[in-house]
């Protein structure tokens, strides 16, 4: 029969919280993509370059994360998964800023609701919020300890009413300044009362001279994703100037290593990307550039 001392020690051990998962691990354990959201429905499996982005978002020591992204890099799914983690693990006021109201409605209906509905850890996590007349509102939801608002940048007056700890902004280059101010700056001001705020901004650049995401990236540690050459092992960012092909035959495209000039075929790309690493070129704010050809 266990002694009182043994019982006490076991009780104290049971009170110790389990080690916190990295956000990338939590996403792969808890998030399920349903049919219609992904061509590969089922539990999320992150690409190697996505894992560090996720872990930066989940790192309490990092206030801002900026991603310069190509057209399709899985950022929306990553954003929704990170949002889900805050709902489940760190309840707080959350704001998602998108360019237009149509984007907001599409995001809620096509991504948030299906993913939350398909993921057992999130089922019924978001309740419908009611406006002053008692009607449910599509873009405002509450959950224990926090709330979620999805707001259009084209209506900056909506930002005045929300103080939030977590701010997600997608397609920032589609957000134009109004007579009042930049909607991005207005949204960031709504986080200033929270010392532990989190600001995540991502976009595909549109015009380099006026790009919101490139401006934010320039203020970050400017990380780039580098992969090893199968021939010489040197790390390089995969860039379009290093892609070559036979005249009139684009299907022969291959990558020429800038270090050893070896020409590497497409079949090596998955293993190269899997062995890749992010490298910071400046060490202040976490920022990732995924506009290369990975």
Label each region the model flagged.
Residues 2-294:
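Phosphate/NTP-binding elements of NTP-utilizing enzymes
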């Amino acid at each position: 029969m266990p002694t009182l001392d043994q019982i006490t020690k076991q009780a104290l051990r049971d009170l110790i919280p389990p080690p916190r998962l990295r956000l990338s691990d939590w996403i792969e354990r808890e998030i399920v993509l349903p049919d219609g959201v992904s061509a590969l429905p089922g539990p999320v499996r992150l690409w190697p370059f996505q894992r560090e982005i996720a872990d930066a978002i989940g790192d309490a020591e990092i206030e801002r994360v900026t991603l310069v992204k190509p057209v399709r890099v899985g950022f929306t799914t990553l954003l929704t998964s990170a949002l889900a983690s805050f709902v489940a693990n760190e309840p707080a006021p959350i704001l998602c800023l998108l360019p237009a109201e149509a984007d907001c409605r599409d995001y809620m209906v096509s991504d948030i609701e299906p993913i939350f509905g398909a993921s057992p850890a999130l089922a019924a996590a978001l309740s419908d919020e009611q406006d002053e007349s008692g009607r449910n509102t599509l873009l405002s939801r509450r959950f224990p300890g926090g709330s979620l608002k999805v707001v259009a940048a084209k209506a900056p007056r909506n930002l005045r009413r929300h103080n939030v700890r977590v701010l997600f902004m997608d397609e920032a280059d589609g957000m134009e300044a109004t007579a009042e101010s930049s909607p991005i700056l207005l949204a960031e001001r709504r986080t200033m009362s929270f010392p532990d705020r989190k600001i995540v901004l991502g976009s595909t650049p549109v015009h380099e001279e006026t790009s919101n995401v490139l401006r934010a990236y320039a203020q970050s540690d400017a990380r780039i994703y580098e992969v090893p050459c199968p021939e010489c092992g040197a790390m390089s960012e995969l860039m379009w100037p290093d892609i070559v092909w036979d005249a009139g035959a684009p299907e022969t495209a291959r990558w020429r290593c800038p270090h050893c000039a070896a020409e590497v075929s497409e079949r090596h790309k998955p293993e190269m990307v899997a062995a890749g690493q992010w490298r910071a070129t400046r060490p202040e704010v976490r920022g990732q550039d995924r506009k290369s050809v990975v």
